[in-house]
C-alpha cells in the first residue's frame, strides 16, 4: 500500500481488528510505503505485520490500538519530514492534545523496535512493551503511560524526556546508552508514586538528568524512587 503526498485514515470501530501484512512474507504486497501521513482513528485495533520500513512519512495514533507484530517495522517513520526540517519533525505520535478524550495505544508486544526519529507520547497515549520486548528511541518524549515487563532504551547519543510517574511504570529496565541523555520531569505526586514502585534505570555510559524533576523530600537521596545501576553513567540536577 503506497501512501504518497496524502493522508491515509484508518478508522476502525471498537472490537474490530484490521491486519496488514504477513510476518512470514517480507515482500507482502500489503506492506506500507510512501511519504504521506497515516492516522489511526476509531477505538478498534490496527495490526501491522509487514516490513514497513519503506514508509518514511509521519504516523499519528489518535484513538484505539496499533500493534506491531514484526521487529523494526517502522524504523524510518518520519524520515521525509525530518530530512527537510530536522528542527521541527515528528515520526510516530501516540495520543493527541486535540482528542484528549480518547485513549491511544502503541503495543509492541515482545518485538524489538527502533525509532530513528521522534517517538512522542501525549498524556492520553500508552506504550506497552511485553517481556522480551524492547523499544529503542533516539529523540522525543512521553508524557503518557509506558507499561509492561519489557525494556525502553535511549540509543547512543540520543535524548529523551519522560514526564510523570506513569511514564516510568515499566517493570522492566529503562536503559540509557553511551552519551545519551534521559531527562525526567514530575511533581511531588509523581515522586510519591515512584517511591512506592521504583523504576529501574540502567546507565550504560549515559546521563540521567533530574533538573526538571521535583525537589526530593527530607532525607531522600536522588535515587529515592529510582533503582539506578550500570557503569560509567552520570546523574545531574539531583
Protein language model annotation of sequence segments:
Residues 1-238:
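Beta-strand-rich extracellular passenger or scaffold domains
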Amino acid at each position: 500500500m503506497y501512501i504518497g503526498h496524502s493522508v491515509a485514515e484508518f478508522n476502525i470501530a471498537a472490537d474490530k481488528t484490521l491486519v496488514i501484512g504477513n510476518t512470514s512474507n517480507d515482500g507482502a504486497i500489503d506492506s506500507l510505503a510512501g511519504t504521506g501521513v497515516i492516522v489511526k482513528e476509531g477505538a478498534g485495533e490496527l495490526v501491522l505485520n509487514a516490513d514497513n520500513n519503506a514508509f518514511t512519512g509521519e504516523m499519528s495514533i489518535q484513538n484505539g490500538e496499533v500493534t506491531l507484530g514484526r521487529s523494526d517495522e517502522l524504523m524510518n517513520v518520519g524520515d521525509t519530514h525530518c530530512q527537510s526540517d530536522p528542527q521541527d519533525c515528528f515520526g510516530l505520535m501516540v495520543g493527541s492534545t486535540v482528542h484528549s478524550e480518547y485513549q491511544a495505544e502503541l503495543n509492541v508486544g515482545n518485538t524489538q523496535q527502533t525509532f530513528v526519529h521522534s517517538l512522542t507520547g501525549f498524556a492520553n497515549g500508552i506504550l506497552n512493551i511485553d517481556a522480551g520486548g524492547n523499544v529503542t528511541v533516539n529523540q522525543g518524549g512521553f508524557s503518557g503511560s509506558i507499561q509492561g515487563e519489557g525494556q525502553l532504551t535511549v540509543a547512543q547519543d540520543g535524548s529523551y524526556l519522560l514526564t510523570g510517574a506513569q511514564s516510568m511504570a515499566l517493570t522492566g529496565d529503562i536503559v540509557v546508552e553511551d552519551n545519551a541523555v534521559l531527562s525526567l520531569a514530575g511533581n511531588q505526586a509523581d515522586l510519591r508514586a515512584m517511591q512506592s514502585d521504583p523504576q529501574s534505570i540502567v546507565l550504560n555510559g549515559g546521563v540521567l538528568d533530574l533538573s526538571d524533576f521535583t525537589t526530593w523530600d527530607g532525607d531522600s537521596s536522588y535515587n529515592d524512587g529510582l533503582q539506578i545501576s550500570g557503569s560509567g553513567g552520570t546523574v545531574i540536577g539531583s
